[in-house]
Regions:
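Glycine-/small-residue-enriched transmembrane alpha-helix faces in small-molecule transporters
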Residues: 1-43, 89-90, 94, 98, ...
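C-terminal-most transmembrane helix of multi-pass membrane proteins
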Residues: 3, 7, 45-46, 53, ...
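Hydrophobic alpha-helical transmembrane segments of multi-pass integral membrane proteins
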Residues: 8-13, 39-58, 83, 137-143, ...
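Hydrophobic/small/kink-forming positions within alpha-helical transmembrane segments
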Residues: 19-22, 26, 53, 89, ...
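Specific transmembrane alpha-helical segments of multi-pass solute transporters/efflux pumps
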Residues: 24-25, 56-115, 150, 232-250
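Hydrophobic/aromatic residues within transmembrane alpha-helices
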Residues: 31, 40, 44, 102, ...
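Helix-helix packing/entry segments at the starts of transmembrane helices
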Residues: 41-43, 111-117, 182-203, 236-272
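Hydrophobic transmembrane alpha-helices of multi-pass small-molecule transport proteins
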Residues: 52, 133-153, 172, 206, ...
Length: 330
């Protein structure tokens, strides 16, 4: 019962993260009108890392722990924390950077759909690594993919593959590896500290790349300050940290299915903020993604067992009542 409760809470945390990411998409789109990709990623990651430092301190205080750099005296846990944070930082940097480059050569709809290829990559890589995926998981993957296709690809006849599409798929592969790295380390490390390290790594790499490949200037940065703040504190600092915390109690193959809600929330954000209209195709896509999440999270064998037990108990109660009535009549 306690395990189910933790799983439900973690799912709600991950859904909250996807809602933040979906609404942050509008802010990020606005920021790209003023600053370039590496500058945007670097600044928002730096802001996220700084934001998480007091969060770590408050978390330790609430737990009654002494505030230290690593949060543990165990050398093995320190090593895992640093390695997990380093790997997460590298993979999220590579994934988001390739995505920003790839989106210049493809449509937004196709980019959104191809990015969600991590829905397939995560269970396939898990299978290669020897982890079993139940039937529900595979059914949910297929349903979610169909939903994402309807949501993101508006013109069926024009679906062709170009350089941008290939880059988006490669980006999705690195997002999948990022999810699996979190799954590997999160059970025995502090998730908030790991997220903080992740963003310091991402900030350093992206800002170095920004000064090499781009021409960042203060005027443009000030023009995009609200979008950077929103993306840094909420999308990165809160959203990605909620993802890491949630993955403690959610199987790796279910995580990307829930994360696919990001596209649903970005669509809702477009309707609310930009007054965009939602087509019947997009509505069906949203419904299919919700169905996929329910299928992935539901243990149908357990439900069937409970249903059979309830029926058996009801039949037993009826038989006992009949026997009691017969004795009364005698």
């Amino acid at each position: 019962m306690q395990k189910e409760k933790k799983s439900i809470i973690s799912s709600l945390l991950l859904i909250t993260a996807t809602a933040i990411w979906g609404f942050a998409f509008v802010a990020q789109s606005e920021a790209m009108k003023h600053i370039e990709p590496f500058t945007m990623n670097g600044l928002r990651s730096l802001l996220a890392a700084i934001f998480l430092i007091p969060v770590v301190m408050v978390s330790d205080t609430l737990k009654g722990k002494k505030i230290t750099l690593f949060g543990t005296n165990e050398p093995e846990r320190r090593k895992d924390l640093l390695l997990g944070g380093l790997l997460c930082g590298i993979f999220v940097t590579v994934a988001s950077s390739i995505q920003q480059i790839g989106i210049q050569y493809t449509t937004v709809g196709k980019a959104g759909f191809l990015t969600t290829a991590y829905i397939v990559f995560v269970p396939v890589i898990s299978l290669i690594l020897g982890k079993k995926i139940n039937r529900n998981g595979w059914v949910a993957v297929v349903v979610a993919l169909v939903g994402m296709f309807l949501l993101c690809v508006q013109t069926f006849g024009s679906f062709s593959v170009n350089k941008g599409d290939v880059l988006m798929i490669i980006s999705s592969l690195f997002f999948a590896i990022h999810i699996l790295v979190i799954d590997k380390f999160v059970s025995h490390t502090d998730p908030i500290r790991m997220s903080c390290i992740q963003f310091f790594i991402c900030a350093i790499v992206c800002l170095v790349c920004a000064f090499i490949f781009e021409q960042p200037n203060l005027s443009s940065i000030f023009d995009a300050w609200f979008a950077i703040f929103f993306a840094g504190v909420l999308s990165a600092g809160v959203g990605y940290t909620l993802q890491i915390v949630a993955q403690k109690n959610i199987p790796a193959h279910i995580t990307p299915i829930i994360m696919s809600l990001e596209s649903v929330f970005s669509l809702i954000a477009g309707v609310i903020v930009l007054n965009e209209k939602m087509s019947w195709q997009e509505r069906i896509g949203c419904i299919l993604i919700f169905i996929a999440i329910i299928v992935a999270q539901t243990d149908f064998k357990e439900l069937k067992a409970k249903f059979n037990k309830t029926n058996a108990d009801n039949k037993t109660a009826v038989l006992k009542a009949d026997e009691s009535n017969e004795k009364t009549e005698e």
